[in-house]
Design a protein with these regions (language model features):
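Short linker/helix segments within small regulatory modules
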Residues: 99-112
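Intrinsically disordered, low-complexity terminal tails and inter-domain linkers enriched
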Residues: 142-163
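Long, charged N-terminal interaction/targeting segments
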Residues: 1-77
Length: 163
C-alpha cells in the first residue's frame, strides 16, 4: 500500500490519486484512462500495466526519494493540493474560518486555505515546519518554509465547534 506516499506527493503539490478498494484491472485501466503513472509495490501489477513503476522500498522516506528522483519531480509549488482528497486549495480570508479551526490557531495564524472539494482548512503551522524539516533532512529540493500550509482542520461537517 502506498497511501502515505500518495499523501506526501499531494503535500508536495502533485496531482496524486489513490485508488482505494479497486481490483488490479480497474486500477490499471484508471491509470491508463487518466494518463497517470501507476506507482505500485506489486511486481505483477507493475509488469502488466504499461508505464507502471514499481516502488521497491517499504520505507516512506526511501519511497519518496525514489519517486522524486525517478520522475524528476518539481517541488517548487508545494502545497497546492488537499492531502486528503487531492483537490486544489484556495486561499480564504481569515473571517471565513472563524469557528471552523481551533481558537488558538485562529488567534495565531493570518493565512488560511480551503480545499475546494472536501472543505478542509489548512494553515501554516507546526506540521508544515515538521514537513519542511523532514524534506530538508532528505535533501529534497524545494523544501522551503514559506508557502501554503500542512496543518488541517476536519471537513466542515465534522468541524471544531465554536468556542
Amino acid at each position: 500500500m502506498l497511501g502515505s506516499l500518495a499523501k506526501w506527493l499531494r503535500l508536495l503539490g502533485h496531482d496524486t490519486t489513490y485508488p482505494g478498494p479497486l481490483g488490479d484491472v480497474e486500477i490499471g485501466a484508471t491509470a491508463q484512462n487518466e494518463d497517470r503513472v501507476l506507482l505500485t509495490r506489486d511486481r505483477e501489477l507493475a509488469r502488466r500495466v504499461r508505464g507502471a513503476y514499481r516502488v521497491r522500498s517499504d520505507d516512506l522516506e526511501e519511497q519518496l526519494l525514489d519517486v522524486v528522483r525517478r520522475f524528476s519531480l518539481d517541488l517548487a509549488e508545494s502545497m497546492t493540493r488537499c492531502s486528503v482528497c487531492n483537490a486544489e486549495l484556495e486561499s480564504v480570508r481569515k473571517p471565513q474560518v472563524k469557528g471552523r479551526v481551533p481558537d488558538g490557531v485562529y488567534a495565531r495564524q493570518e493565512e488560511f486555505w480551503r480545499c475546494a472539494s472536501c472543505g478542509r482548512f489548512y494553515w501554516h503551522g507546526s506540521h508544515w515546519d515538521n514537513v519542511t524539516v523532514r524534506l530538508r533532512r532528505l535533501g529534497v529540493a524545494g523544501a522551503h518554509e514559506d508557502g501554503p500550509p500542512v496543518d488541517e482542520s476536519p471537513a466542515p461537517d465534522s468541524r471544531v465547534p465554536p468556542g
